[in-house]
Amino acid sequence: MSTNIAINGMGRIGRMVLRIALQNKNLNVVAINASYPPETIAHLINYDTTHGKYNLKVEPIENGLQVGDHKIKLVADRNPENLPWKELDIDIAIDATGKFNHGDKAIAHIKAGAKKVLLTGPSKGGHVQMVVKGVNDNQLDIEAFDIFSNASCTTNCIGPVAKVLNNQFGIVNGLMTTVHAITNDQKNIDNPHKDLRRARSCNESIIPTSTGAAKALKEVLPELEGKLHGMALRVPTKNVSLVDLVVDLEKEVTAEEVNQAFENAGLEGIIEVEHQPLVSVDFNTNPNSAIIDAKSTMVMSGNKVKVIAWYDNEWGYSNRVVDVAEQIGALLTSKETVSAS
């Protein structure tokens, strides 16, 4: 039995999640809430500058979209509490707007009739469980929580990497820098922004700024609380980012042993190890959370380690959103099956 999902928001992540979810047999995309007409949404799903032409044909219809024989209802209401989730029997509302990332706001989807909510960004508070695949997804709890957060693209990259290093060698402390492609909260030309560096043109400069990844990491890896800190450098590329992680370990290691730990981690689809001398464009539309750049792994004094991990901050992250939605759906189905028996 497939899980009925609705997607709130058709920005970069919302559209990528839709592309992926439409090809997942365990998910049934029932509805989209967006402020644009069907023709605009269909065009932006079919044709994407970064990820290319979609391999399915999405067509606009009256008040909706059609993909083959499958129809998706299109609604437009800025207040999630007014959305027809109960009428449409929505199991999971995926909120990709970034505007309802506090549990007290996301609860509007539950009030509208959705069984669960999945946020495509870090939670800003409230009764929300943050879930990162390959880190704490085995603790996903649909009994205790109605609202879940898939954290950030950077947390999804650094989380599995830090967990492997900590489990195998023990992390004493460390610093991370994410070299991040531009995002739509930056300015194409100089304009006001609460972060004065992000107020500057994203196409002209390397822009130092903050990242919430280290803070979010403690929610999914509490054993590393207080041990990692970091910052971001926004660079003028349209997609694909990397994490530069430097840690002091409890054990002495070699670069080969570090790379082998990632190879043996058993996190297929989450961590990939790349031995070729590649550059960022080569990882565009890579579905993994983290791709270890094996040639860049360094060790100094036996226990100081540098690891470079690439990630497609759009496509890789959106794959994890779909993975978590699928996991929540499977747990809901299992619960309903038990209740019916």
Curated annotation (Swiss-Prot):
CDD domains: GAPDH_I_C, GAPDH_I_N. GO terms for cellular component: cytoplasm. The active site is at C153. PROSITE patterns: GAPDH. It is found in: Cytoplasm. GO terms for biological process: glucose metabolic process; glycolytic process. The keyword Glycoprotein does not apply. Keywords: Cytoplasm, Glycolysis, NAD, Nucleotide-binding, Oxidoreductase. Pfam families: Gp_dh_C (PF02800), Gp_dh_N (PF00044). D-glyceraldehyde 3-phosphate binds at S152, C153, T154, T183, R198, T211, G212, R234. Its main location: cytoplasm. Catalyzes the oxidative phosphorylation of glyceraldehyde 3-phosphate (G3P) to 1,3-bisphosphoglycerate (BPG) using the cofactor NAD. The first reaction step involves the formation of a hemiacetal intermediate between G3P and a cysteine residue, and this hemiacetal intermediate is then oxidized to a thioester, with concomitant reduction of NAD to NADH. The reduced NADH is then exchanged with the second NAD, and the thioester is attacked by a nucleophilic inorganic phosphate to produce BPG. Disulfide bonds: none annotated. NCBIfam families: GAPDH-I. Its EC number is 1.2.1.12. It comes from the Bacteria. This is Glyceraldehyde-3-phosphate dehydrogenase 2. NAD(+) binds at R12, I13, R78, T120, N184, N313. The record marks H180 as: Activates thiol group during catalysis. It catalyses: D-glyceraldehyde 3-phosphate + phosphate + NAD(+) = (2R)-3-phospho-glyceroyl phosphate + NADH + H(+). GO terms for molecular function: glyceraldehyde-3-phosphate dehydrogenase (NAD+) (phosphorylating) activity; NAD binding; NADP binding.
